[in-house]
Structure formats: structure tokens, C-alpha cells
Amino acid sequence: MLINQDLAAFMASPVMIILGTRDDALVPEIARAVGAVVRREEGCVDLAVSEWQWSKTVANVRANGQLAVTFARPSDYVSYQVKGHATVASAAAEHVALARRYIESMASTLGELGLERRVVAPWLVERDLVTLCLSVQEIFVQTPGAKAGQLIEQFP
Amino acid sequence: MTIRLRDLAACFEGVIPSIIATAAPDGMPNISYLSHVVLVDDERVALSNQFFSKTATNVRANPAAAVLLVDPRDGGQYRLDVIFEQTLDSGGLFEEMAIQLRATSTQVGIGEVMRLRGVDIYRVRGVQAVPSPTPRQEVSSREAGLQLMAAAAVARRVSEASDVGTIVDAVLDGLREAFSFKHAMLLLKESAGERLVTVGSRGYERSGIGSEVLVGEGIIGTAASERRPVRVSDMSRIRRFSSAVHASSDEENRTRTIALPGMPDAMSQVALPMIAHGVLRGVLFLESSQRLAFTREDEAALAVVALQAAAALALAEAEILEGPSSVPVVADQSVLTGRGFRVVHYAYDDSIFIDNEYLIKGVPGRLLMYLLRIHQREGRTEFTNREIRLSEDLRLPDIKDNLETRLLLLRRRLEEKAAPVQLLRTSRGRIRLEVAGRAVLEEATS
């Protein structure tokens, strides 16, 4: 299923990426990703994640695949959440390079908002990267306001 | 090492957004940013619920959730393992969070969106630090109990002061010396109740004495209308409530309004209501260019200072009503040492201009004209508060509440403008007019 071009561009821009998963007992877990590649035609998003920092999240995806991802622009809180099923792959060279670029641009974006590099460093970690390949099933508006939580696209 | 919630106080300041993850009964997770997480006690946190409706739905079916908190000083991340307990839509905690949300969201012009629907209480089962490649910084936190000692030191100073002016000074000097808070102002409510007027400040280029804030407007006005402290730890996204930072006396002369002082680069602000006998008397306001300059403990200590100052001020005003009754002896004053000066009074708003410089308006303006007229007529320079209060000429039924405050405002404003007429407080309930040169009094018609 095709992902809207504007949305794809938004997801690949310097936005904060947060991940939600759960274990077998339905206990949720939180993590951050350091970069996204959108494969529009396939309806897929690849996410670079540090397994060293977020081991429980990667284990949850390996176990059940259910994954929710919110992309939020720090300057104005414009946000979208995508949900679907994901698999874990080892990070290809392109994903390692992607994470590098993302960390650079994110640190400078947050720097413009007055956050020092030493403060944002713990959120932008590239140690032991893996790739989560998310097959998107639902897309929601998440920007704070009346439309928050509204479903904008659903793929069978 | 076990991490206690209270060790994470900085994470609850709302500087870096927190995150919550939940899961629906079918297992699908949900991940969302949170605007406010509040520390309730060592075992519970409260989350504001404005619009993250999927989160609210999920925890009602599956109460297990994860919350990620971030320390704004070093970026350190902490994962809380939480269980949803209940939703509150009233009570002290709800009110406190609603006010905080309103005060900060009216600043950014999204008051409507940020209406608080409920406060969700979660029990915290565990706290873990998220691995970080950068070493955690040893951030020096102020020693607990220090604020209490500082508040006691200010209270001592205030207790020694006996009139409105010295009480205001005792509070502001005390904040600077005992707390090391360098930018502060004290505003008192007008008896009409719609406005707060600055009667003293420290740390600003201009004192701003006589400047006004509407009750309900901005952080200061919200603390007044809600009668609760309002604190902001990161102003970087909040528009300044006063754009009048570059005020000049030309501007004052044109608008007959004195601009509120303020720091152009303020990052933290706190406003404390001053209440005595159940009546709001004013607001104590502090600001800093540092993020997180005022902790929750600071806020509590400052709230005590503000309330004690309110009680002292109420007492000082009440005592004045029983001040000396004897009208001072008519002194033969020949104070024609300086050059003459012109005092123009505009009756419609009681504004006063001395040699074309705006001084003040309203009741303090009327008071000055009254004193100068008697001075011209009788040559008298000594006055009692009692005779002013009883004066038929002033026709001020409401003035008895805060005559001292208005006289203080007039006195400080005359001082600040280095006017050729000055007001001195000689003893309790008595004032003296010092006039350098002959005053030419004029009534302006327009």
C-alpha cells in the first residue's frame, strides 16, 4: 500500500521518533529510533534502533512484531503515529549511514531550540544498531488538538 | 541502586516532554508524548489527560503502562513501570494541574486546546535508568532544608518592618540575600480588584513602580485570579507576557502608562499569591534567565514568604486607621530654594505631569494634588494619614483600604523621577512634603 508522499517526507525529516511495543504479558515498552527510511510503494518504514540501549523493545518486536511509532516535529509538535507489524533485521551499511545523518541533523535541530548537544546525546545513540522493518497498517494524526488520535489511513 | 521518584524532581518540570506507552487488549501498542507528569508521592505520578484518548482507552482495558521521563539538565532517561489506578476530575491536585496548564497555554495562545479533562493517577512499580553512552553528570542540587532557612530569614526581616514601604523592601531584599534570587517584583492589588500595581522591584534596569498587570493576565495575573502559585521552568516556547521591555519615559509621557519591568531572556518564572484574611492583597513575582531556576521546594518556601508578607501588609494598613489624630502644627515654611516647577493635573484620569514628565495617575495623582494645594494654601508640610483619609475634598470612599499603599506608590514614583517634590514618611501615620522651589499648579482641561 502506498504511503502518502508528504507523510513519507515528514517521517524522513529531522523529527523525533518514539517506539511503543509490548511483551507477552502486554506490558508496554518505550524506545527511540535514530532515523527512518520510507519505502512508499511497499508501505514499509525501516527504523534504525540501538539494541544496546533499547534491548527490551527489540526483543518484543522479535517475539510478537506489534509496533507503534510516533514521529513528532519538536518545533511545533506536529505528530503522526503509524502502527503495524515489524521484523528485526541486522542494520545494513545504508542504515548505519542513515543513523549518522539523522543524529547530526536532529542534534542541530534541537540545538536551534536551545538544547545543548550534551543534553540530547543520550537520546541519539547508534551503538549496536538493528533495523526494524515496519509494515504499516494504520496512520493516525497525533498533533495535540481536536484531531489527535484520528485515523487518516488504514491498509488491509 | 534503587532510584526513588523524588530523586527525579527535575524530570517533572515539564521542560523535556515525557512519553507514555500503552497496549490495547489485542496487543497493539500506542506511543504518545505527554505534556505534564506530576510527582504525587514516592509511589504515584499524575498525568494530565487533555487529548491522548487512545492512551486513556487502553489503560482502562489494560492498566499496565510505561512512562519515559527525561532529566533536562543532562538528558538522562528514566523508565517508569506504572499501573493505572484512577482518574480525578476535581480536587486539589486536579485544580493545581488545571491552573498550571491554563497559565502556560494562554501564553502560547492555545488556551482552548489545553483544557484539562482529567488527571490520571498511576502507581509506580519500578524506576530504571535507560542505558546511556555518556556518563551521567553530577548535577549539584541545592541542599534540602536550605529553602526553609532562607524563608525564615526573610520572615524575620519582614517581622521587623512596620509600614508598607519597609515591608516591601524587607521581602525584596530578603529574597536577594537569603535566596540569591536577583530579579523580583512585588505587586499589590488595587481596591477595585481588577489590577495589580508594582510597588517595588529588584534587579531591573527600571523599577517599574506604578506599572500595572490585569488580574487574570499572564503568569502574574493568573496567580492572582486563581490564588495559587504559578511556576514555569522553561519559557523558551512561551511568549513574554509583556512586550514593553524597551520602555522609555517618552513612551510613558505619551501613553500615561508605566511599563512592567521584565527580563527579555527570562527562562524561569514563578508568581506567588499574597493572601491575608482570605483576601488577595497582591502577587510576589520572581524570574531568572536560567532554566529550572525555581524548584518545587523553592516555590513552597516562596509561597510562605508571600503569605507572611500579605499578613504583615494587612496589619500595617489596619494600624494606619488608628494613627495619630492631631493635625500637625502649621509650620511657617519658606521652601523657595529651588527654581519653580509646573504641576499639571488632568482631572479625567487624575494623571499628573511635573515639568512635562508623566508622574502617575489615579488615586496617587489625586493625593499629590491634594497635598500640594494644602501646602500652597497653608504653608503646611506635615500631614497625617488620618486627615487624608477623612478629607472631604478627596471624596474617596474606598481609599481607607490601602491608603498606605497609594502613598508608597506616590513616594517611590516621586523618588524615581527625582521630582522637585518628595514625600517622606516621618513616623507611623505621618508624612512630610518636601518641596524644592515654588510649585505652579495647573488644571488641564483636556
Residue ranges and their predicted role:
Chain B
Residues 207, 264, 281, 287-303, ...:
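Regulatory loop-to-helix N-cap segments in sensory/regulatory domains
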Residues 54-100:
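Short, structured beta-strand-loop surface elements
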Residues 161-199, 316:
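Helix-loop-beta substructure at the N-terminus of cytosolic sensory domains
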Residues 357-390, 410:
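Short amphipathic alpha-helical recognition elements used for nucleic-acid or partner binding
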Residues 323, 359-360, 374-375, 404-446:
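DNA-binding patch around the recognition helix
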Residues 199, 206-262:
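Regulatory sensory and allosteric helical modules in signal-transduction proteins
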Residues 256-259, 267-275:
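A short, aliphatic-rich beta-strand micro-motif
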Residues 27, 132-165, 281:
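Signal-transmission linkers at sensory-effector interfaces
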